[in-house]
């Protein structure tokens, strides 16, 4: 709404953007439009949340460390039940909620490890494997290993469905351009 306007970090704007250039330039309006398109799609109004979940956000990665957080992918049901002190109108999921999560803000919670796994999936055509950081532990008496990770049989965490190779290429190229073109890397 007008009280909570959404705009690009570049106050003059970037002009017409594609998904690839939107990623490369970190142009929020590209993602606002994407979020709104999902919100107003009567068949899949929570399709963006489905995409996030399909890529492993909102659930643990299975790393061999204690107390891993699952994060949160908010949706209409979550908002309705979470904000119990708010009015019924304020508890309704709206386009602003969707545009916020489209840029990773608002009520969405993801861990750095979940994002690393999502990037792993982008690099591997949708395949994600359970990450490991624990290699071995020496027994208390120092005589041998109490545990040793053998690295055999990588355990697949999930495989996100890729709609098309060209869609995946757009995202990969946008990520490449973040680093290797004059974009937000100069900011």
Where are these regions (language model features)?
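Beta-lactam-recognizing serine transpeptidase/beta-lactamase-like catalytic domain environment
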Residues: 1-187
